[in-house]
Each structure stands twice: as C-alpha cells, then as structure tokens.
Amino acid sequence: MNVELRIHGVAGASPGSVLYPGSDKPGKLLEDGVSGGVGFYRPDPQPTPGWIRQAYVWGGLTSGSKTRALWLLLLPFALVNIAFFMTPHRIVDGRERRKPLRKTVDSLQRLFALSLTATALFGFTGVYLNILAWQSAHTPFGGPLSWLSTLNANDISLRLSLSSLIPALALSLMWLLSTRTWKHTDQIPAPQGPPPSPGPLLNRRRMWNGGPPVGRLRSLHVAFGFTLIATTLTLADPHPWLLTAEAIIGATIVLTVALPQAATRKDPEAERERLLTTFCTTLRWAGLLVYGAALLVPLSGPGEQATPGPLPGFDPMVESVFWTQIALMVVVAIGVAILARGQEDASGDNRYGRALLGLAAPATMLIAWTYTAALAIGAAFIVAEMVGTPAFSRVDVPEAIVLPESFAWALYAVPIAVVMLIALALWLWLTYRRTARKINDLISSHYPRPEHERVSKAWAAAALTDRAQAVFATIALTAIGTLVLVGVIRTTQLTIKPWPPLVLAGAIILIVFVIALMVVGYAAYRLPSLRRTVGVLWDISTFWPRATHPFAPPCYSERVVPELITRVNHLIADGNTVVLSGHSQGSVIAAAVVLQLDPAARPSTRLLTHGSPLRRLYARYFPTYFDTTTLREVQNATPWNNLYRNSDPIGGPVATDIDQAVWDPVSPPPDSPIRGHIDYYVDDDYRTALNSLTTP
C-alpha cells in the first residue's frame, strides 16, 4: 500500500486544511498520537483509492499557545542561535578542514550569546536599579519606591535590594520557561541508528539529541545572570570579599561556556558527560547564592546615601560589555570570512549564491545585538522620561536621569537606519517594476493580454525574496557605520558631542518601536490569526536546535524529526511505501527526515516537495547543512520530485533533474486565482507527481 504523509509549512495549518484542501465538505478526522494538537491525523474515509493519506500537524509548537506571542522578546536569542548554523564549514572530499578555526568561531559565538543575556539583563537593571532605585531618589517623582523615604535618609540599600528582585524575577522566568520547553523538546531522545558516516551533517542523529548540552548552557546562563545582578548591587556598596567571589564565579562561567564540551552533542547511544553537567549545575547554584549574599549583606550595614548621577559602576559595566561584544563580532566575522573563502557552489549552478558572500552569520549576530540594544535603550528612555529628564552627562538639574553616553551614540543609528530602509524600499520598488516589465515579455505567449499585468506583478513580487539579503546588509552596514563613528570618536578622544536633534529623533523612533512591539505582542496574544503570522518567525528560526543560547524559543525539530522517523519506520515495517510530502517548511523537515532514516528504510521511501525553500533560502543562508552536496545526498537516498511556481515568494527550484515548474495561474480560464505559495495539493501537477513516484 502507498502512504502519502503530508507535512505542512509555515504559519500553521489545521488538520482539515492539510487532509481536505479546498474542500467545502471535509470528512471526519481521526487522531493518531496527538498531544496538544501536534501529531498525526488521517481522514475517514480515505479520499483516494489505493492510497492511505496521513498528515503530521506541528504548527501548534510555534503558534498554538497564546504565550507564543511573548517569544517576540526572545527573538535576539533565536537570531544568535541561527547565526551558529549559518557559519560555513570548509569541507574538502568529505572531510572538514580548518576545524580548530571553526571550533574557535563556535566558542566565540557562545560567548557572544552569553553577552546578549547580559545586555538583556542590563535593560532590567538599568531601569530598576540605576533609574528607579538610585537616580529617581533625587527627583521630585521619587520613583515607585518613594515610600521608602519615610523610613530614613539612608534607605538606598533597601531600595536597591527590592528593585533587584525584578531583574531576578525576569531571569527566573526565563529559567523556568526554558526548563519547561527543554523537557518537552530537547529531552525527547532521538532514535538510535547506525554509526554516523562522514556525509552531510544532517544525517547525524546527534543534531537532534540536545538534552544534555542545552541543559548545561541553561545552567551557565542562569549563573551568569544572577552573578551580573549581584555585581550591579555590590558595586553600589562595595564589599571586597563579595566582589572577589563574583569575579571568580563570573570568570569560571565564561571559561566554561568557551569550552567545546559545554555544547557538544553526542549520538543517542553515547555516554553522557555527567561530571561537566554537575559542574555547570553547581555554578548555577553558586550564582544564585552570590546574588542572595549581594541582596542581604548591604542591609546589615549602616546604609549608604545615594549620590547624584548614575549607579556607581553601572556605566563602566555596560561599556565593557558593549566593547566586548564588538570585539567578538569582529573576530567572528574574520573567522567566518576565512572559512567561507573559496567555498562556492561546486555544481556550477549559480542561480542562488551564498547570501552576503558567506557572511550571513556575523550579519545576523549584529542584527540580534541591535534588536537587544534597541529594547534596552528604548525601555531606559521611556522610564527616564517618566521619572525625570534624560541626560547623558551630569547636569545641575534635580530631575536629571543620567544615561550612559554610549546610548546617545547608539541612537545615531536609529534615524540613519530609517533613512536607509526608506532608500532600500525605493530600490526594491524600482526593482519590482523593472522585473515586472521583463516578465510581461516572457509570459506573452502563455497568457492572454488582459492577464499580463496581474500575472507579471505577482511573479515580480515573488522575485523580491531573492533580494532579502539586501535588507540584512542595510541593517548590518548601518550598525557597522555607527560603531566605526563611535569608535573613532572614543579612541581619538575627540570633543565631539552627540547632536541633540538626531539623538532626540532616535529616541522617539526607538520609543515608538518598543511600544509597537508591545502592541503587536498583545494583539498576537489575543488574535490567533496574527499569532500564526508572527509564528512564521518561529517556524523558520526554531527549526534549528538551541546550540548557543538556551533561552531561545525551543527547537520543534527535536520533537518533530524523531516522531516522523518513528512513524516512517513503523509504516515501512508494515510493508508500505511512504511518500513524504513536504510543503514549504515541511519540505525542510522532510529532507532532514530522509537523511536520518536507516539506509535499509530508504528504498521504501519517496520525497515530494512543493513550495520548497531548500535551495532558494536554506542553501544560501545555511550552506553547511543544505548545500548542493547535501541536496544531492537526499536525491541519492530516495526518488524525489519538486514542484514550484514562479509566483511563489518562498518556494523555488532545487535541482534541474527533479524540478517541475507549475504555471500559476492556470490558463484557461481567465481570472483564475493566483495561488502563490499555497494550495499545491489541489493542482493536477501535484497528483501527477505523486503517482509518478510510486509507478514502476
């Protein structure tokens, strides 16, 4: 018997829309191993004689729960995690070259991810400790802890201790959420298979066996976060023994994160590194203990009087992390450039070259850092404006709230970025118009003249996806330009000060950005349709395991891929031929499953992809995992057909000998719908391609 196992794509999908596409009267649905809306479904009765149709529905893992809307705050962590998988490996004749350099780049990326945790916490400590607890004590507003002023004149220690509970609570919440998702995704064991071969990285089951390494990284990030909050408290009222303990714990955490063993994934049957896991857990409790000491020790002393200006030690801490992050990004960029050099597509097919010349990883890291800094700086400006008057240097104004001067220079990038994005939008519009004119000439023999404009516009809009790297480059270049400007000014000690109008414009735009993000998050929490739209971010980003940042949204593939492998093996054991039918992101999942199957199971497996981004996006941005060698390995593993439309903004061709272009819209009749990325199932070409895979 032939089994068609459908795997849907981005933006979620209901079981009915996958099993009964385009039907006004769908039949009954039977669940099979469904948990939380995720699992296998089949229609009753089966709609096609001689075929068993099933669907694997996984959209609930990224857009099902209302709490997924809060993942917008975790986007920087997801981006820095994606950057890890964008990093190229130099593979020559099936063997990796320059492995020490690649491992060094991996370690630096983990350290950068750790620094992002620091930046996120600076957003909380900057607001609650620096502004509300310390500086607002001098303002007429007094802050939300103004009632403490009725106790005594030296209440600053109590103000700081109480305020530190909010950052600690935020960190504890990230700890709790990452632990819960870790148990439901990373801890699901990958099925044991044959010994790993020196082939594509995707055929190694260790990739989906992330329980131990993600657990270790989580412990280290939690430890670092609590140590950072403790240090912020201690610098306001220094105790040498406490500062020494914090420095030792912090340095130990940094060194441990840099160790390759901290994040090493092993095959399912391999022995776990229990000693290192125990050490990381010990560091986590040490970080929590030192925070408890920093919280309570100042309360036992005579108390300190808050001095005008920022919280002692806070600005230097922010600045040191700021420049450390820049150094990490520069070194990673150099390392990635060396790894990417000379790694062009060996097949000679240059339709889709490597994105950003192979430098997508550092560009994505830069965007993640920009996003995190924007949230932290925007929140600081909003609160500073509420309780006083924001300033960047000490001024003789009672209500002045002094923010780090680096914030002012960072704000320079905001209006400049807006101007550059407007210019980019204009360029994309001109490109769209020019492409539409070219397409109009190409389709003249296939469509009647009244259809030309509609079809050419749809195809031209879809082609803009191939310009996506221009957006990455614009944001990255803006940030780089600003950093160079600030670096020159700071290192040469020029007396140039930030230009107030540009700083004001940046502050306003940044405040609007933060408020807009909150509005979108709230709306996504309330509206399932918007939540599915926002969920597209997670459909793409959380396909990848949490290799560098444990607080990133969970990797659904660590549940999806093992479940699909188990189902395919079960169906094949019953004597069936299984056609994995992957649409959009489902095609990426299906390709990963094919490579994970035991060689003995592959002859009974077929692959049908439609609207697939495998070559158009994944091979460009993740060449280590989806280059032509890997895609050729999938072809060698099982018969494969790929359908694509020129009107599809996501899917595209994969390989010449398996591709089949589908006209969209179909003609005649006129005015038939342009389907773009959806409803491949209802095309006649789909049924033809499906049957051809099982016809001798």
For the regions a language model picked out, list residue spans one by one:
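Short helix-terminating capping/connector loops at secondary-structure junctions
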Residues: D574-G575, A600-P603
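Active-site signature of alpha/beta-hydrolase-fold catalytic machinery across serine-
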Residues: A592-Q596
